[in-house]
């Protein structure tokens, strides 16, 4: 963590490794996305994937991706989706972009609100993932064990 006294040096040091960290987020997220795209009850919201509704726009304007993705999980049992998120061992709970750790968040319909671009179908639940810098095999294994809770 950075103190106010050394914040300039801290920011400078963190900026030096930003490109390396973002590349790792991207690489890890691509592996996780490939794993998750095998599940029929999960619709992956990640523009890097060719079957994403935003792939063409992403390809036109961007040269890389991030560690952020959304999962639209089809389940009649909301508690099982919450249990899925809560059983993730490597993931913290919360929002992030670019931090070192993987995070997960089960978004409620109230938080989504009236966003036209993010409509959930009946029995769909949104889980937001930030894929961190941990070993991608460990991240995938953690998600795999947590998926057993979905009903």
Kindly label every feature range from the protein language model.
Residues 75-76, 87, 102-151:
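PLP-dependent enzyme catalytic core of the Aspartate aminotransferase-like
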Residues 36-45:
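Short acidic amphipathic segments
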Residues 13-35, 62-66:
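Structural signature of PLP-dependent enzymes
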Residues 13-20, 67-75, 127-132:
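Short, well-ordered beta-strand elements within core beta-sheets of diverse protein domains
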Residues 3, 61-63, 119-122:
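Solvent-exposed alpha-helices and their adjacent loops that cap or buttress functional pockets
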Residues 1-11:
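Single conserved hydrophobic/aromatic residue that forms the stacking wall/gate
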Residues 44-107:
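Conserved PLP-binding catalytic core of the aspartate aminotransferase-like
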